[in-house]
């Protein structure tokens, strides 16, 4: 049986996002056909504990978890009084949190939210698209695990694209490109209120980095046929570039009963940190809600999904009809 290692930049549990659900479905399917191992990057100890849930569900899968946050920092400096130093660190973190809250509160106005903010630039991934150095402990860990006899190593998400430089050359390496970063950067830049010279520089440097990093993988998987064709043009070749089949199964013959609307409720579903979802909610509050009020139309604007907490007060001030309901657990979807 072939041995495959998946490397992803998070712990995909609980299943409270589309990405987590898709990865869960994929591993749940392929573990019956291959010997599966998964290497997670956990930002905190609490996040690492979620792996225990997956271990209970998949007893036939091997898990490797790198934890960025540790109880004791291995490279902590030598200090005269460790207890006093620890207290000062906590005080510093507390002060920084209070400073951040002050910054948010001073910009907490409806005018800022609906008119003055450049949401596209604020949420843009362009500044994070150029190579950022990894934790050396993580690179050592990935290298060690990757050289333990796998037939296939699959890396997912742009955050980890540079790992191709440290993977063994005698295995089949795959990069799953969930979103072509240079395309997203180009699309976002076109929506900036103004494009700066530094934006153009970052775009070109990131585009070159993405091209070179992809050369380190023997196979590349895009999520759509459109992205596959774009990648082929971008890389100058079509071989070993594939479009991924759908993983989630749907009942094609199931009939859905039409239920007429009985509530005057508009529902928007989407994670606020994913562009352009927040921008869309702001657009609804700015362009659509005033028109509905003018027509004396009573309604509720329900927003399902996380990522709107930072602007909750502003959104409710601008649109009292809004309901930020967060996540809604549906048994048929959640595990």
Regions picked out by a protein language model, each given a short descriptive name:
Residues 243-330:
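Conserved catalytic-core segment of nucleotide-activated headgroup transferases in glycan assembly
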Residues 174, 200-206, 211, 215-254:
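Donor nucleotide-sugar binding/catalytic pocket of nucleotide-sugar-dependent glycosyltransferases
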Residues 82-152, 158-161, 193-217:
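Conserved nucleotide-sugar donor-binding subdomain of glycosyltransferases
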Residues 3, 28, 140-153, 161-174, ...:
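Glycosyltransferases and closely related glycan-assembly transferases
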Residues 1-72, 79, 89-93, 291-295:
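N-terminal subdomain of nucleotide-sugar transferases
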Residues 4, 8, 167-191:
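Active-site proximal beta-strand in glycosyltransferases
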Residues 211-215, 314, 329-335:
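Short acidic alpha-helix that forms the nucleotide-activated donor recognition element
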């Amino acid at each position: 049986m072939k041995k495959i290692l998946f490397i992803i930049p998070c712990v995909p549990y609980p299943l409270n996002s589309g990405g987590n659900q898709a990865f869960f479905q994929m591993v749940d399917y392929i573990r019956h056909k291959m010997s599966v191992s998964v290497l997670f990057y956990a930002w905190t100890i609490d996040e690492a504990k979620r792996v225990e849930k997956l271990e209970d569900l998949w007893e036939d899968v091997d898990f490797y978890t790198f934890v960025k946050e540790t109880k004791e920092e291995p490279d902590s400096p030598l200090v005269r009084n460790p207890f006093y130093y620890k207290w000062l660190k906590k005080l510093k973190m507390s002060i920084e949190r209070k400073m951040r809250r002050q910054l948010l509160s001073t910009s907490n106005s409806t005018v800022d939210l609906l008119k003055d903010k450049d949401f596209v630039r604020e949420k843009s991934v362009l500044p994070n698209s150029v190579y950022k150095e990894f934790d050396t402990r993580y690179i050592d860990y990935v290298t060690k695990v990757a050289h333990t006899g796998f037939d296939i190593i699959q890396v997912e998400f742009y955050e980890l694209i540079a790992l191709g430089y440290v993977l063994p050359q005698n295995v089949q390496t795959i990069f799953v490109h969930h979103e072509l970063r240079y395309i997203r950067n180009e699309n976002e830049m076109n929506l900036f209120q103004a494009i700066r010279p530094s934006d153009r520089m970052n775009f070109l440097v990131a585009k070159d980095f993405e091209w070179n990093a992809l050369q380190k993988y023997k196979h590349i998987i895009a999520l759509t046929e459109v992205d596959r064709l774009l990648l082929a043009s971008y890389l100058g070749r079509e071989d070993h570039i594939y479009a991924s089949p759908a993983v989630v199964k749907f009942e094609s013959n199931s009939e859905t009963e039409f239920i007429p609307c009985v509530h005057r409720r508009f529902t928007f579903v989407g994670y606020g940190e994913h562009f352009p979802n927040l921008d869309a909610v702001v657009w609804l509050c700015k362009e659509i809600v005033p028109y509905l009020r003018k027509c004396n139309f009573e309604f509720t604007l329900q927003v399902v999904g996380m990522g709107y907490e930072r602007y909750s007060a502003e959104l409710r001030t601008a649109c009292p009809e809004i309901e930020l309901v967060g996540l809604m657990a549906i048994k048929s979807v959640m595990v």
